[in-house]
């Protein structure tokens, strides 16, 4: 794994997991954050112009290594990267499997209700992509079933205290993307 900005690389051993990370200063030189193709980050970045942001993007872990130990090592590496570069805020997208909004209405509603971003931290999906997440009242959501079926990564982000922005996006392929 290599940090193009710092010119560092991991030597030797087997690479079994990785995350796509991009610092704000690097993103500015290369057309912005990936998330900006689906979410309006400009107001957030302007409100917090004194802070340094890191986008946490796609993760990939080799088959046979997917589990808590490798996830913890990846997050330890991310935390070391955050400290090394003196970063303040992490942002990014996470995906739900599938593109059938009706079938995902419980999950979308749960996320919208359980961890909404306060106004100063909120981001909104771009209008031409935006799907309303508040599909039903929380009283109609089977929370136990949702928690069982949410992707592990989204559950981990919730445990870490993430905020959920306003709106979801049907991504390219077979997922609905949610900004966290």
Indicate where each model-derived feature is located.
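Active-site beta-strand termini and strand-to-loop segments that position acidic
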Residues: 2-4
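Conserved beta-strand in the GNAT
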Residues: 8-23, 55
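Acyl-donor binding region in acyl/amide transferases
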Residues: 23-162, 168-176
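A short beta-strand motif that forms the metal-chelation/ATP-contact edge
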Residues: 178-180
